[in-house]
C-alpha cells in the first residue's frame, strides 16, 4: 500500500481517537516511513501532551529522537540542535511512569551512555541488571543494548532470548539435508543488508573473492537496495550468483533462497540494523549459521550455529550460546588485505598537535565507560604532551567529556574530536595515532583491526562476553598478546608503561608494519581456506534439535 495512503488512513482514525496512544505511534512511524520525519516527531510530541501519563508515548518519542540522532552521525544529515538531548528528557518522563520496566530502562541507559552521562547511565544499568537477576519472568532487552550494557553472558543470553520470543516467528523444524554428490562444490549462501559501503563489506569482501569455486559455489542474497557504489559492484563480481531480495516479504525471500538448493546459509546480520532473521524461520537451507554481524548468541532456534574462535568463546562458555559454537583455528574476524593503506596526512590537518603522544579511541560514544575514560584522562594529567583523540560526535557527549577533562585540570584542546570520515580518509588519519585504546564491556571490533592494519598497536582488556573479547583475539593474531590485559589494574599499568616508553611504542609500530602481510589476521586467502573447512564441517554435522 502507498505510504501516503497509509498516513491518511491512520490520521483519520487518530483524529477520531486522539487518546489512542498505540494508534498515534503507528501514525508517527507511518509519517517517518513516508519521509516526513518532522511530522513524525510532531505527532509524538502532540501525543505526550494529550496523554502525558503514557510511558509508551514518551518511550516512542525518545526512541524516534534517538533514531534521528544516530542517522545524523553517519554524516548524511548534520546541523541543528541535538535530538539526543531531547531524547534524554523524554526517557526521564518514561522512567518516572515505568521505573522498573526493562523496555524503558535499557534504551534509557543506552541513551545516557551515548551522551557519556555516566552517573545516570550507571544507575539505570544497575537497576536493569538487578531486575534481570531478581525476576524469573520475561526480561526482554534489545540485543545491541544487551551486548553493550550487560557484562554478564548469562544475563545477556536471557535478555536476547526473551527479546527474540516476542519479536520473531517460531521456526519450522529442521528438514533433513539432501545428500550431496561426492566431489561437488558446497552451495553456500550469504544473507546480508550490508552489501555496500559498510564495515561488514569492508571486512568480508576478500573472503568472498578468495572462495575456491571448486569447493564453494557462492550465492549472495542482498536484502539492501543497490546503492550503485563501488563496493556493491565489487561484491557482485565476487559472488558466483547474486540474488536481490530487497522489497520481498520474508516468505517470498525464503522461497527464493530455498529454490537454490543450498547446503549452508550464512546470515551476516544477526541482531543488527536491517536484519531479516524472519527469512530463516521457514528454514530455506538445511544448515543455517550466523557469522560476523552480531557478537553473541542470536538465541533463535532457526540458527543452528555461530562462528567464533577459542578466544571470543573460550571452551566452557558454550552454555551461554543457544547455538552450536563453531570455532575457527584463528581470529574469527576476516580482514581484507587488499583494503587501502593511504598515506597518513599531517597531524595538523586532522586537528592534532604535530608532536607528542596521541592516544586514540575510535569507538562509538556508548562504548566509552567512565572507568576507561578516567584512566585515559589520568594519563593525560601525568604526560603534558599527550592528547586524547576520540570519534564521539554526539553534542551532549562532547560536552560531558570536556567537563570530565576540566575537572582534572586538563585543557579542552587536549581532547580532540574527529568527525565522520569515509573509509579511505579514516584509514589514512588513523596512522596519526600512537596507541589505540579499547574498552569494555563492548570493545573494538572493526575499529581495532583498522588500527592494527594502519600500524597502530591496540591496548585491550579481555572481557567476559564475545563483544568484550574481540580485541584480545585481534592482538593475539598480530603477535601482540601482551597488549591484552586481564584487569583494570593491568590495563592502567600497561597504559602508563607505554606512555612512558615511546621507544616501545615505536618498536610495536615497526612490528606491525613489517609483519602486516604475514600476520594471520590479514591472511585473507588462508582465512578463506579455514572458513571453507568450517562450512564443510557444518554441512556434514548433525546439529541437536533446538530447545
Model-predicted regions and their roles:
Residues 222-227, 387-400:
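Glycosyltransferase donor-sugar binding loop
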Residues 457-466:
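Short hydrophobic beta-strand element within catalytic cores of glycosyltransferases
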Residues 451-453, 476:
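Short alpha-helix at the nucleotide-sugar/activated-sugar donor binding site of glycosyltransferases
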Residues 207-214, 370-384:
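Short hydrophobic signal-anchor/transmembrane segments that target glycosyltransferases
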Residues 269, 438-444, 462:
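Short Ser/Thr-rich beta->loop micro-motif in glycosyltransferases that lines
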Residues 468-479:
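Short acidic/histidine- and often glycine-rich active-site loop of Leloir-type glycosyltransferases
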Residues 191, 362-363, 391, 418:
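Short hydrophobic "strand-cap" motifs at the C-terminus of beta-strands
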Residues 1-353, 403-409, 422-435, 447, ...:
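Alpha-helical solenoid repeat scaffolds of the TPR/TPR-like class and their adjacent stem/linker regions
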Amino acid at each position: 500500500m502507498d505510504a501516503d495512503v497509509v498516513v491518511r488512513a491512520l490520521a483519520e482514525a487518530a483524529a477520531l481517537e486522539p487518546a489512542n496512544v498505540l494508534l498515534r505511534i503507528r501514525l508517527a512511524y507511518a509519517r517517518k516511513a513516508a519521509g516526513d520525519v518532522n511530522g513524525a516527531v510532531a505527532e509524538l510530541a502532540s501525543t505526550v501532551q494529550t496523554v502525558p501519563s503514557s510511558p509508551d508515548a514518551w518511550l516512542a518519542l525518545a526512541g524516534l529522537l534517538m533514531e534521528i540522532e544516530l542517522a545524523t552521525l553517519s554524516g548524511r544529515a548534520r546541523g541543528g540542535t541535538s535530538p539526543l538531548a531531547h531524547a534524554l528528557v523524554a526517557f526521564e518522563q518514561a522512567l518516572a511512569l515505568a521505573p522498573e520496566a526493562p523496555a524503558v530502562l535499557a534504551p534509557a541507559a543506552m541513551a545516557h551512555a551515548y551522551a557519556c552521562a555516566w552517573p545516570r547511565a550507571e544507575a539505570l544499568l544497575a537497576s536493569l541488571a538487578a531486575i534481570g537477576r531478581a525476576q524469573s519472568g520475561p526480561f526482554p532487552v534489545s540485543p545491541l543494548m544487551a551486548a553493550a550494557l550487560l557484562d554478564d553472558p548469562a544475563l545477556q543470553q536471557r535478555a536476547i532470548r526473551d527479546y527474540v520470543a516476542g519479536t520473531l516467528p517460531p521456526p519450522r523444524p529442521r528438514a533433513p539435508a539432501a545428500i550431496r554428490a561426492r566431489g561437488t562444490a558446497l552451495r553456500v549462501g550469504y544473507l546480508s543488508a550490508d552489501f555496500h559501503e559498510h564495515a561488514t563489506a569492508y571486512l568480508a569482501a576478500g573472503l568472498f573473492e578468495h572462495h575456491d569455486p571448486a569447493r564453494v559455489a557462492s550465492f549472495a542474497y542482498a536484502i539492501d537496495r543497490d546503492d550503485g557504489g563501488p563496493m556493491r559492484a565489487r561484491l557482485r563480481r565476487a559472488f558466483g550468483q547474486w540474488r536481490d531480495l530487497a522489497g520481498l516479504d520474508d516468505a517470498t525471500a525464503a522461497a527464493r533462497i530455498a529454490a537454490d538448493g543450498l547446503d549452508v546459509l550464512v546470515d551476516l546480520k544477526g541482531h543488527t540494523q536491517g536484519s531479516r532473521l524472519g527469512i530463516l524461520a521457514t528454514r530455506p537451507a538445511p544448515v543455517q549459521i550466523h557469522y560476523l554481524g552480531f557478537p553473541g548468541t542470536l538465541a533463535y532456534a532457526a540458527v543452528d550455529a555461530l562462528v567464533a574462535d577459542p578466544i571470543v568463546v573460550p571452551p566452557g562458555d558454550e552454555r551461554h550460546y543457544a547455538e552450536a559454537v563453531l570455532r575457527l583455528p584463528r581470529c574469527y574476524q576476516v580482514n581484507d588485505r587488499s583494503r587501502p593503506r593511504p598515506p597518513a596526512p599531517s597531524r595538523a590537518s586532522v586537528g592534532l598537535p604535530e608532536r607528542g603522544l596521541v592516544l586514540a579511541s575510535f569507538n562509538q560514544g556508548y562504548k566509552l565507560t567512565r572507568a576507561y575514560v578516567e584512566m585515559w584522562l589520568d594519563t593525560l594529567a601525568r604526560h603534558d604532551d599527550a592528547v586524547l583523540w576520540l570519534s564521539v560526535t554526539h553534542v551532549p557527549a562532547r560536552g560531558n567529556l570536556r567537563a570530565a577533562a576540566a575537572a582534572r585540570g586538563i585543557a579542552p584542546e587536549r581532547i580532540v574530536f574527529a568527525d565522520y570520515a569515509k573509509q579511505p580518509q579514516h584509514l589514512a588519519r588513523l596512522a596519526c595515532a600512537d596507541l589505540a585504546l579499547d574498552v569494555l564491556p563492548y570493545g573494538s571490533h572493526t575499529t581495532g583491526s583498522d588500527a592494527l592494519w594502519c600500524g597502530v598497536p591496540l591496548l585491550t582488556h579481555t572481557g567476559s562476553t564475545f563483544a568484550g573479547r574481540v580485541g584480545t583475539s585481534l592482538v593475539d593474531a598480530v603477535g601482540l598478546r601482551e597488549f591484552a590485559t586481564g584487569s583494570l589494574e593491568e590495563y592502567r599499568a600497561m597504559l602508563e608503561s607505554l606512555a612512558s616508553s615511546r621507544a616501545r611504542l615505536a618498536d610495536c609500530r615497526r612490528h606491525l608494519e613489517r609483519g602486516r602481510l604475514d600476520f594471520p589476521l590479514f591472511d585473507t586467502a588462508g582465512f578463506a581456506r579455514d572458513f571453507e573447512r568450517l562450512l564443510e564441517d557444518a554441512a556434514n554435522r548433525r546439529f541437536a534439535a533446538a530447545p
